[in-house]
């Protein structure tokens, strides 16, 4: 149950629209998109207009798009990515690509943010800095964060509660 709604019985493609933001262990970015476009992908999920209104560029569509750009810029700035807004993600270092992936998930304005190995391949200091920024923004939008991570030092530095699993059992 998420925000008072049973989501487990929804079709899988609708569950993603139910207040969950997520990243994957392996980056799932589009190399042909720039950093801003990735943030806008997340925001696009929340826009509430139909294809006809979009086709005719109705005033409320233009307002929502302008607001989406503002929110995207705010989020990119918070995650120290604003200076890279027009860079293709394939041209960025791995650590910045991880941040772009997280930005796209945060841009969905989730109730719960699921992060699968967000620190994989990053030095602990860089991962900790990124996760502190994620936690700040999650607090700003009142989102819970669930981290699946093997880096115990990172988890201890950013978590309110830690649950350890071994062979599928809580220990």
Task: Identify what each model region corresponds to.
Residues 1-171:
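Glycine-rich phosphate-binding loops of nucleotide-dependent enzymes
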């Amino acid at each position: 149950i998420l925000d008072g709604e049973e989501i487990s019985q929804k079709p899988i493609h609708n569950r993603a629209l139910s207040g969950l933001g997520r990243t994957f262990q392996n980056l799932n970015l589009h190399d042909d998109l720039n950093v801003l476009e990735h943030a806008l992908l997340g925001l696009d999920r929340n826009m509430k207009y139909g294809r006809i209104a979009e086709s005719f560029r109705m005033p409320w569509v233009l307002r929502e798009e302008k607001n989406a750009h503002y929110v995207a810029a705010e989020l990119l700035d918070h995650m120290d990515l604003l200076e890279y807004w027009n860079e293709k993600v394939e041209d960025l270092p791995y650590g910045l690509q991880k941040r772009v992936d997280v930005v796209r998930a945060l841009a969905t304005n989730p109730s719960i943010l699921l992060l699968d190995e967000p620190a994989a391949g990053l030095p602990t200091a860089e991962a900790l800095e990124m996760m502190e920024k994620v936690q700040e923004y999650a607090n700003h939008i009142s989102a819970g964060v669930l981290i699946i991570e093997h880096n115990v030092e990172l988890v201890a530095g950013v978590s309110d509660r830690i649950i350890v699993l071994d062979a599928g059992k809580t220990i």
